[in-house]
Amino acid sequence: MEDKWLEQLKELICLSEEDLKQLCEKAKEIFIEESNVQNVSAPVIICGDIHGQIYDLIELFKKGGEIPNSRYVFMGDYVDRGYNGVEVLELLLALKVKYPEHITLLRGNHESRQICFAYGFYEEITRKYGNANAWEYFTDLFDYLPLAALVEGKIFCVHGGLSPYISTVDQIRLINRKMEIPREGVFCDLMWSDPDDIETWIISCRGAGWIYGWKVVDEFTHINGLELICRAHQLVMEGFKYWFQNKNLCTVWSAPNYCYRCGNRASILKISQDLSRTVDYFDYSEKSTTSAPPKTLVPYFL
């Protein structure tokens, strides 16, 4: 069944509602067994936001290599903004079901009922399936996605960032993740926080999460024996950015020409067996802007 689904999805044809229900049930069985902080072996490729840009996801796999020849960590935000969140999620979930050890799918702030209702995914689902059943299948599944990944105990991957309420990775392991993303607290902060050139903490203008600075990152990496924190969540025009003097934090952004108009590049971060790092950049697919009729997008960058 998984092979049939993958063959269909690689042709960019959405699954039937019944097949989608089965896919989500199989994926849920896998996610239930995964921990809040999923351990991942190197070599691995770390990816940022996709936001429904299916043709650019296909370019990403061309750049990084097909699964199972390559292993991937995706740091969330698969839906909203772009035209093809359904196809993106179905393809990634089908790969997860077929090759569970070769792809890790983390939760992002858009893997939330409230956010993806407001920013396009709900409307896309009802347009493509004619009802909201698929919405229920997907959003139920979101509650089981891991919150973070740890590559060889040294590279910590999370969608947004850190929280003033924790200092260790082990504290993240204790969170009850099987719920809608809360409006505040550690779980919320991991999804919503951003770095900036400050020392410690300030309140985020997003209305959720925090802004964290170099001292916070230095302390978290030191306490937990980390070499690097990888996160996504923020558009960077060049596709990749190291933060702070110690370069112990980076943003990976994997949606080129975000919203089909930003003109930015995208990247993936390749981690080798010895944990050395290579950034590969890619630009948007010409097909991406013709993947669906234009629709109004909410002009606020979450």
Model-derived segments and spans:
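Feature recognizes metal-dependent phosphohydrolase scaffolds
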Residues: 1-302
